[in-house]
Amino acid sequence: MRNQIADASPELVAPLARPAAVSPVVVPTERDLRLDLFRGLALWLIFLDHIPTNIVSWITIRNYGFSDATEIFIFISGYTAAFVYGRSMRERGFVVSSARILKRAWQIYVAHIFLFAIYMAEIAYVSSSFENPLFAEEMNALDFLKNPDVTIIQALLLKFKPANMDILPLYIVLLLLFPPILWLLLRNAVVALGASLLLYSLAWHLGWNIASYPTGHWWFNPFAWQLLFVFGAWCALGGAQRLSRVLASPVTLWVAIGYLVFALAVVMTWHFPRAAFLMPRWLSEWMYPIDKVNLDVLRFAHFLALAAVTVHFLPANWPGLKSRWLRPAILCGQHSLEIFCLGVFLAFAAHFVMVEVYGGVLMQVALSVAGILIMVGVAALLSWYKTVESRGGTPKRPSDADLAGGSA
């Protein structure tokens, strides 16, 4: 990409390389530790949810409302992407910042393929060594074991995805689409958010999605989930300030709490079917199914309610954000790509132990705690190495969206 830019004529590059004279958009400059904290917590929750029949997963938010940790992860990813690349686009222009975004998308793609190779090797080894093909079936890996040549090609095209490996392909596609979205956000944020909402609506009404292999479609429809990613970017580029009065209103707080209580009551009827009669029939017919694939409006609203309550009770300047007790989650959030990949590997390892060794409650708790401790240890090691590298005089590299935070 750099060579292409260098070889292009100055007349072609100059208008794109220089930031245009547009209305100023505030790009956050201060690090917001809440982003790292909640992204780290989301990674822990995703890990716990990825372990089948794990009793510890009852502490995750998916059991008490319509949304889950995925919404947190995607929103923060959009926020931090705008924080990093928004400033770059304003200072260095569209071409350079777009090249950085595409480079990051390529890095995540490489990480996804590497994780796929390790993950498939782990599943294949366990399935064959313990003569238990159910592992491969549960992890959606049977096609790989039967037709590895075809399946590998489909995996490279992001069409074949084993269980628990759907988030990174979504993130890759969102980053590939991000340069023009960011350009528009910096010039007219309302139009950009409106275009995102329009695409979301079209995806719902026209059934747009990307095909998967061997059948079906993407578990996270990028045409729908982009709305949450763009909304996060919009918040980072001044949207949060525009909503500050609304978020500070007691009415907003009580409406959000009321919706969270309503969602909790509905979800309890899923866990306790005998209470299902409490749900009016007309309400059930209107609500269901609450579609995760296409980011149902009820899921989006539930995330917004959670965010509104969180912002109200957890300000950016809360001293507790710098306490040692929250440091483990913050460290994991600052290295989200590596920790997510590690979590996928650890979740299957925990599932294997629970099936082949012992699956009691104590083992489930021990494996869950051990997995999180390993994730924290690796995040601390990565942070230490980054510190040593910077002290050693290594030239500072531009931040990427995994290591960034901005003020909300």
Stretches found by the model and what they are:
Residues R2-A408:
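Alpha-helical transmembrane segments and their immediate juxtamembrane cytosolic regions
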